[in-house]
């Protein structure tokens, strides 16, 4: 059986850097403080995951200023445009 003291110090959770606290003044500077995107763990019910929201809690896509950066289409490489002249050459 492993020694519980040595296994405590060999775990990833012990040695990883702590997650920094969120500075609300930085959010105010970005204009995001008045619209909370995620709820804290205490406000979620037991059956829900932290990032999920019900239909009534979801914001409209037009109201989310960061939606364009979180979509697949923003981060993928653009599709190369092919002109009809190029197709004729093939």
Curated annotation (Swiss-Prot):
GO cellular component, one term: centrosome
Signal peptide: none
Keyword Nucleus among record annotations: yes
Location in the cell: Nucleus; Cytoplasm; Cytoplasm, Cytoskeleton, Microtubule organizing center, Centrosome
Residues with Phosphoserine modification: 60, 84
Keywords tagged on the record: Cytoplasm, Cytoskeleton, Nucleus, Phosphoprotein, Ubl conjugation
Alphabetical GO biological process terms: extrinsic apoptotic signaling pathway; intrinsic apoptotic signaling pathway; positive regulation of apoptotic process; positive regulation of DNA-templated transcription; positive regulation of mitochondrial depolarization; positive regulation of release of cytochrome c from mitochondria
Cross-referenced Pfam families: WRNPLPNID
Span list, region Disordered: 33-63
Chief location of this protein within or outside the cell: nucleus
Motif extent (Nuclear export signal): 24-32
Post-translational modification: Ubiquitinated, leading to degradation.
Family membership noted in the UniProt record: Belongs to the MLLT11 family.
Function summary: Cofactor for the transcription factor TCF7. Involved in regulation of lymphoid development by driving multipotent hematopoietic progenitor cells towards a T-cell fate.
Subunit comment: Interacts with HSPA8 and LAMP2 isoform A; the interaction may target MLLT11 for degradation via chaperone-mediated autophagy. Interacts with TCF7.
Stated name of the protein: Protein AF1q
Species this chain originates from: Rattus norvegicus (Rat)
Gene expressing this chain: Mllt11
């Amino acid at each position: 059986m492993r020694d519980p003291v040595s296994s405590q110090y060999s775990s990833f959770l012990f040695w990883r850097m702590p997650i920094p606290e969120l500075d609300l003044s930085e959010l105010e500077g970005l204009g995001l403080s008045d619209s909370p995107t995620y709820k804290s763990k205490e406000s979620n019910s037991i059956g829900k995951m932290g990032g999920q929201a019900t239909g009534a809690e979801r914001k409209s896509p037009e109201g989310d200023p960061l939606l364009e950066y979180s979509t697949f289409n923003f981060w993928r490489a653009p599709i190369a445009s092919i002109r009809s002249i190029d197709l004729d050459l093939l």
